Structure formats: C-alpha cells, structure tokens
Amino acid sequence: MEVQILNYNNSILNSFLAELRDVNVQKDSMRFRKNIERVGWFLAYEASKSLNYQVQNVTTPLSDSQENTVSDAVVVASVLRAGMPLHNGVLEVFDTAENAFVSAYRIENPDGSLEFKIEYNAAPNLEGKTVLLCDPMLATGNSMLLAYQALLKHGTPKQVIILSVIGSKKGVEFVNEKFPSNSKLIIAAVDPILDEKSYIVPGLGDAGDLCYGSKE
C-alpha cells in the first residue's frame, strides 16, 4: 500500500489541522465540521492524481478544446457518523460520484476490551470501481477494515483509496497490512501514540462528538 502524509509539506492544510486540534476552536462545532470538509478537498485532490483519465472534447464560445477528464467510476464511501463532513468535502470535488455508507462503531466492554460492529451497509454495485473510503480518524484501523469488508458484499472494487484526517502510526501499519496491495492511504497527519483506550494522541478528541454533539 502506498501511504501519503500531507502535512509533511507545508500548505494551508496545516492551518486547518491546527484549528481542528485546538480545544478552543473546537467549541464551534460548525467550524469544526467545515474544517473537516476543507481537509476533504485536499484529500480528494490528491486522490484524483491516482485515477485514470481520458480525453474529452469540449466546445468553448470561441473554438474547440480537449481536456483530460476522470474516466474511473468513483464511489465515495464513509463510515458513519464522524465520516459525514469528510464525505461532503470529498463529494464537493467528485460531484458526480456515487455514494456508499457504513456504520462501523466500537463498544468498550466492562473488561476494557473493544468490540467493533457493523449495523448499516448501503452502497451501489462496487465491482470494478474506485472507492474513496472516508473516515476522519484512523485509530486502530479495525473499523476501517470492517467497513471495507462490509462493502465487499456489493462487489470487488478496482482500487480502494483511504482518506483520513488524522491517524495513529499503529493504525497506518494495520491498514497497510490488511488492505489489498494496490490500495492507497492519503492522510493529513499521523500521530505517534495510540493510548490504552485506543484514542490517537495528541489527536483531536472524538471527531463524531465534536461534529454533532455527545451521545449517551
């Protein structure tokens, strides 16, 4: 798997990451969601470089022209609920893409162990298509893998490109091992620590709660 980490190079993306991590800016949930969307634009742009293109003839008001346009059938897939703002940002770039949604979540058992469950899986036929799998936080990588395995019920994609905002080093290593070799991970930042509760450190906290409020 090819891994691309965007904040290794300076760009305005790093300013959005700083706001996402900042405990004071996080108090504005609308701004937090918007910053996730903005990061999605960058991830989608980088993903577009891995796609196939074909020549398209277009007519301008003055003459004819040719442009290379995406020829792959693209499906934007997200892991609910935290994945929605990222999904929206990616969809703003790939605005003709199909859409898929999976609910993958973790349950903490009384003994401290984690259990991951899938309860919702809605997708078009994925056979031979390029799937952009969106989840803002790549912690252990288990929910990402479960989402991918659930989506395989709808056909085998030609390629999977994972798009994430922040991940742990352990999570990156996990998906690198478990996903097909022609997959790609494009991620804005990778943090060094995954704590005993499987939270990314320094991370940014619970992305779903910061987007949509706490849950019982």
Predicted regions and their residues:
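PRPP-associated nucleotide enzymes
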Residues: 1-216
